[in-house]
């Protein structure tokens, strides 16, 4: 499905640009009101259906007539890089049932409620240790909160789950920063990807020689050795877990700080009463949809959705970012309110349905501990430049912050 010359005048290009540094594209509100399911043109001239209402987005996420397999004809890719990546061997996030759940269940035990609860003391220790280092080094000059805190927190925790030796943390964090912070070239990012894959392959080999009870060790022992998966699968799954949520988590920590600076009365409430933190985290993940371009599908057969006929082979992009600002589900959706009372399952920051983010509980635990500890340790933390001068990610990409200079 491609746009013709006449169509391009009326069919908008997607991804849309954010309305401002931190606000979702204005087009979403207009489409929710007037055309909840409409066509958009992608980078290569192909067309896809864009779904913007909460109810329809949830339907897309759970309809088995729609496929997550990126190799299917018509699957909507948003960039040339995405199109190239679609040729790689898939992991569970790009699989349909039953293969999806077969592979996902191999790593799920590491992200259960019990496992995350057991990790909380380690997360707390990691967060507090990084903040203590910041305090010890002082802030005569502004300190980049991303480099010194927001990036290492989620990195160190996922490395520990995977089983990365502590002495390699700095090297891996450096490679991860190159591939994810948007300031490196495409070539540098690709080279960093290769370095990470090579490193993980070496780790898989080590576990074959010396079994250990970490995530890579269990993948090797329970799946690779019995022949359920190949070595390349083990490497790709480890890579997915290493990088998938990392940039998103870094951004959510930084965005949480900025959002509190924009809402000083809520910041004061949060400092006075840490029991408000879980509600703050839920609202943060609704208000700023950290991963907003991942809910893509292709129709396996002709089907009807919201009164529109979707043909087999046509792509669908379900905007969880738009759904998180749906007036029918969240009154005054453009207002940040940490007292907002809603079912956490209605917040779509982590997706919806069988493909909902496997690490949601871990991510929320990390964010809760970060915001319980950050202002308790640095009560006078402030951004050292005007908020409208903060360097953000490009406006057609996921909302995020590149650098966040702070003092305290």
UniProtKB/Swiss-Prot annotation:
Top EC category: oxidoreductase
Required cofactor names: heme
Pfam families, per the entry: p450
Binding residues annotated for heme, in chain numbering: 357
Gene3D superfamilies documented for this protein: Cytochrome P450
Protein EC: 1.14.-.-
Top-rank taxon, per record: Eukaryota
Keywords annotated in UniProt: Heme, Iron, Metal-binding, Monooxygenase, Oxidoreductase
PANTHER family on file: P450, PUTATIVE (EUROFUNG)-RELATED
Name of the protein in its database record: Cytochrome P450 55A3
Organismal lineage: Eukaryota, Fungi, Dikarya, Ascomycota, Pezizomycotina
């Amino acid at each position: 499905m491609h746009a013709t010359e006449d169509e391009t005048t009326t069919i908008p290009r997607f991804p849309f640009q954010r309305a401002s540094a931190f606000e979702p594209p204005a087009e979403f509100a207009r489409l929710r009101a007037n055309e909840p399911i409409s066509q958009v043109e992608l980078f290569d001239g192909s067309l896809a259906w864009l779904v913007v209402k909460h109810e329809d987005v949830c339907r897309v996420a759970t309809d088995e007539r729609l496929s997550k397999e990126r190799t299917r004809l018509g699957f909507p890719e948003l960039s040339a890089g995405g199109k190239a990546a679609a040729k790689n061997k898939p992991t569970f996030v790009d699989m349909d049932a039953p293969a999806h759940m077969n592979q996902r269940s191999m790593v799920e035990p590491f992200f259960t409620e019990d496992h995350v609860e057991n990790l909380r003391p380690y997360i707390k220790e990691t967060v507090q240790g990084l903040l203590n280092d910041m305090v010890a080094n002082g802030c005569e000059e502004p300190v980049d909160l991303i480099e010194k805190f927001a990036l290492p927190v989620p990195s160190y925790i996922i490395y520990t789950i995977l089983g990365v030796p502590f002495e390699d943390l700095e090297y891996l964090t450096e490679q991860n920063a190159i591939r994810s912070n948007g300031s490196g070239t495409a070539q540098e990012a690709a080279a960093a990807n290769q370095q990470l894959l090579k490193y993980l392959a070496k780790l898989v080999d080590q576990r074959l020689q010396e079994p250990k009870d970490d995530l890579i060790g269990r993948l090797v022992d329970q799946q690779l050795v019995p022949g359920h998966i190949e070595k390349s699968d083990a490497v790709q799954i480890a890579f997915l877990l290493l990088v998938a949520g990392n940039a998103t988590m870094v951004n959510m920590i930084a965005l949480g700080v900025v959002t509190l600076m924009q809402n000083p009365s809520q910041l004061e409430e949060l400092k006075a009463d840490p029991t408000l933190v879980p509600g703050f985290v839920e609202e943060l993940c609704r208000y700023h949809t950290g991963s907003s371009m991942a809910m893509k599908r292709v129709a396996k057969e002709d089907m009807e959705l919201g009164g529109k006929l979707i043909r087999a082979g046509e792509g669908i992009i379900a905007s969880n970012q738009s759904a998180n600002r749906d007036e029918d589900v969240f009154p005054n959706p453009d207002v940040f309110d940490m007292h907002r009372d809603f079912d956490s399952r209605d917040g779509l920051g982590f997706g919806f349905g069988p493909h909902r983010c496997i690490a949601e509980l871990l991510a929320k635990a990390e964010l809760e501990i970060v915001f319980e500890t950050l202002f308790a340790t640095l009560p006078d933390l402030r951004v050292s430049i005007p908020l409208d001068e903060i360097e953000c990610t490009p406006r057609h990409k996921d909302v995020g912050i590149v650098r966040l200079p702070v003092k305290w």
